[in-house]
């Protein structure tokens, strides 16, 4: 596994953080969490938006503004894009985050909302769909197995990821290297290197593919392809094979685009959002 700046590696995502508020009714108690903050915007059907690794909710700003008639719940993971890490500083990350978002859904009184997740957020969205918390799920440019995004498997890459995480967070040289990566990655400059390393470790050890047959909610998968036809065909085949276990899943390539499809192809991505939310 290389630590280069390939846009399709696990170290992806960007965007500015927005102001994080609880926007419930006047009698509602604030949602307090040491793992996430939530911004609520708009009125209408509920949609939960989860950004990717080292990203803030700002990645969704243009889309949220273009889609009135929905109440968007923008998740901001602590440790990413300017928020202090707090409970995300050490230990497992992905499963606790999924549990915390599920707790928010319950606390806010949401009834099986639509959930859209980009990159790492797509993994969290899938977990919420599998747990019955989401009414429908859109995954943006993420495979069921995080390691597969760099051509590995959870069994093969997981051990390496454990060692890599220890190196990046437990040695002076590793921390310097991770700091350099963070400094060079758009959207990650204000993210905590420890949280990024923990997220990479968790993602490399997660494979939700075997659980897809028990997913009972509608699933849309949007993925980025480049301008090279042969490469686009290979990526499309890879995604279709990875999601074959999800009966009725709708897969849509979008391109030419890099990993941040909402920025590279905003009009086409907005059209896919409309189709997903109208279902």
Indicate where each model-derived feature is located.
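Flexible "cap/lid" loop of the alpha/beta hydrolase fold
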Residues: 137-166
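Conserved HGGG/HGGXW glycine-rich cap/lid loop of the alpha/beta-hydrolase fold
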Residues: 40-84
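Conserved alpha/beta-hydrolase catalytic His-Asp/Glu region
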Residues: 153-155, 162-219
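Catalytic histidine-centered segment of alpha/beta-hydrolase-like enzymes
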Residues: 257-265
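Conserved hydrolase catalytic core segment
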Residues: 113-148
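Active-site loop/oxyanion-hole signature of alpha/beta-hydrolase fold enzymes
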Residues: 73-113
């Amino acid at each position: 596994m290389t630590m280069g700046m390939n846009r399709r590696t696990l170290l992806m995502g960007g965007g500015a953080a927005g102001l994080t508020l609880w926007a419930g009714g006047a009698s509602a108690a604030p949602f307090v969490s040491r793992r996430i903050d939530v911004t609520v915007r708009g009125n209408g059907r509920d949609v939960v938006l989860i950004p990717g690794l080292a990203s803030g909710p700002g990645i969704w700003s243009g889309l949220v503004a273009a889609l009135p008639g929905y109440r968007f719940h923008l998740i901001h993971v602590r440790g990413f894009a300017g928020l202090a890490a707090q409970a995300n500083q050490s230990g497992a990350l992905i499963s606790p985050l999924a549990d915390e978002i599920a707790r928010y859904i319950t606390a806010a009184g949401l009834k099986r909302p639509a959930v859209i997740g980009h990159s790492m957020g797509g993994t969290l969205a899938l977990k919420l769909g599998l747990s019955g918390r989401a009414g429908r799920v859109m995954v943006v440019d993420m495979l069921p197995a995080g390691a597969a995004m760099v051509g590995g498997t959870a069994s093969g890459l997981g051990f390496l990821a454990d060692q890599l995480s220890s190196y990046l967070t437990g040695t002076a040289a590793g921390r310097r290297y991770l700091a350099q990566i963070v400094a060079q990655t758009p959207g990650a400059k204000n993210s905590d290197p420890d949280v990024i390393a923990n997220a990479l470790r968790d993602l490399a050890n997660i494979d939700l593919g075997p659980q897809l047959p028990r997913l009972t909610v509608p699933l849309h998968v949007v993925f980025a392809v480049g301008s090279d036809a042969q490469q686009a065909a290979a990526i499309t085949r890879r995604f279709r094979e990875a999601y074959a276990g999800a009966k009725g899943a709708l897969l849509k390539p979008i391109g030419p685009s890099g990993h941040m499809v909402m920025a590279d192809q905003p009009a086409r991505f907005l059209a896919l959002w409309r189709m997903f939310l109208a279902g």
